Amino acid sequence: LVGNLRDVDGARIDRLDAVLLTHEHADQCHGIDDLRALVIRHRQRMPVHMDQVTADIVGRRFDYCFEGAGAYPAILDKKVDLEIGQVIRIDGVGGPVNILPLGQDHGSIPSLGFRIGTFAYCNDVVRLPEETLERLGGLDSFVVDALRYTAHPTHASVSQALGWIDRIKPRRS
């Protein structure tokens, strides 16, 4: 699991089947160029899944990655297919993976969390709507944002995260 795209090189990742963007903030996507090495190695464009709001912003900001520019070919395949509560399937070398996008509040903007089987990932979140909390039952593992001990306008505090954990009762968090 890569927390943001700038971590790809440092994590020594040899292969990715797809990228899921939670939202358009720089800490999530300002490393998208680092996918170029993987794309060249595997000789196929990288599918990048996102919601419409993210696609509008990231598509403009990194148009050269999605559309190509001059002598540089496009390296990414923009997939605007993430909708809250609608499962998408990603086929990869390890087999198909079903991913459920989850709605969450990141303060000034919405962001997405993801549930994959009995695993859920909810970063960059300050509030989880009731609908999302209901979709988080029965988890083995829950990765959740907790920026600091005190309140923050765009990130959960430790006490908020512990409250969600107490409510949904994952085996690990």
Question: Model regions: which residues?
Answer:
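Active-site neighborhood of divalent metal-dependent phosphoester bond hydrolases
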Residues: 42-46, 54-80
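Active-site metal-binding motif and surrounding structural segment of the metallo-beta-lactamase
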Residues: 1-50, 139-141
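Cap/insert and terminal regions of metallo-dependent hydrolase folds
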Residues: 127-173
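Core dinuclear metal-dependent hydrolase active-site scaffold
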Residues: 1-14, 77-134
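Active-site flanking residues adjacent to catalytic metal/cofactor-binding acidic residues
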Residues: 22, 123, 144
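Active-site environment of divalent metal-dependent phosphoester hydrolases
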Residues: 25-29, 57, 107-108, 127-130, ...
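Structural motif
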Residues: 18, 118-121, 141, 172
